[in-house]
Amino acid sequence: REMGMGSTDYGQAWSDLKVNHESIIDRRTTVIVLGDGRSNYGDPRADLFREFAQRAKSMIWLNPEGRALRGTGDSAIPRYLPFCTQMSHVATLKDLERAVDEVLAAYG
């Protein structure tokens, strides 16, 4: 398989998820997204993300960018955020540990 240094295309990722795996997303599913939410000015397909959020138990987004950068430039995070159960800044292992603790606490 050929790999390249292409741009992030969240819209295509959500389209692929819908076509290939939508049937397995249900009220028992936790969807975890790892990424900065930058669309490179493509269509972020927040409509599909919303559909997954309506089907899933929870939508967790682990974002390496801090809050100050969300919504700047090509960031589509403001379009996804209303459908996220949790949005966490994760740039270090310590951040990841905190985010996992938050997720586990939410499942109580």
Segments from the language model and where they lie:
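Short, exposed beta-strand "edge-strand" segments with a Pro/Gly-rich flavor and a Y/T-containing core
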Residues: 3-8, 36, 86-91
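Alpha-helical structural motif
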Residues: 6-13, 48, 76, 96
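Charged helix-capping and loop-helix junction motifs
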Residues: 44-50
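Short, local alpha-helical segments
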Residues: 33-34, 45, 58-62
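DG-centered beta-turn motif at the end of beta-strands
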Residues: 28-41, 85
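Von Willebrand factor
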Residues: 1-29, 65-66, 71-72
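Von Willebrand factor type A / integrin I
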Residues: 50-108
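Extracytoplasmic/secreted cell-surface and envelope-processing proteins
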Residues: 41-44, 98
